[in-house]
Amino acid sequence: MANLIVLLSPAELTGRFEEAMRAGGASVKVAPVDTLSALETVCRDRAGHFRLVAFATDVIVLAHVLAALGGPAYNLHPGPPEYPGLFPSCFAIDEGAACFGSTLHEMNERVDEGAIVGIDTFDMPAGIDRQTLDALALASAMRLVAHLAEELADIPTPLRPLPVAWSGRRRTAKDFAALCEIPPDISADDFAHRYRAVGEGPDHALTVVLHGRRFRLAPEGDAMVYVGGQAVAAAEQ
């Protein structure tokens, strides 16, 4: 069978991944899937004759699927090893990180815990907001794919782990919800800082609790919807 990379990712990002692989000089077929059932179908049909790469997906790859692959699967994390878990850009902005980037690592049953096989980093621009940082992280991730393209396309050979470990606390949905909640007496400067870190979207916004009621910040105008750092549509109001 021909070499195949199965890309578990939103459809909007397939083209970017394929471009990065070509830029890195790799010749390999890329088959996009965006659901667990579609991935399981590929596993049955190909019986391990492919490499799985996941990016910007909320699909949880179960242990029995990973075990059936015949070799390591890889996840492209949109943040550096210092920011494992959800929404790394938000926490990096909130904490004033000096640099950011992307990480390619082996997948296992626990999120962002597998061996790291590739890193791309860049300096954080001053005053950057979440949408801009997510776009830079996407570009970083595609640079990393291009750099490792030939190794990714060599399906039978696992990528060599780097002597780098994950650090920092793995952020969860609960942590992000706490970041989104602002105190009633927040200063204008602190509000602007938190807004830069969190941004706005169809599924999240800054919130505040007043007199026992929770209020949600309404977006200004038609905010764009972003998938993995790439603008895809305007949010419906």
Predicted regions and their residues:
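One-carbon transfer enzymes
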Residues: 1-237
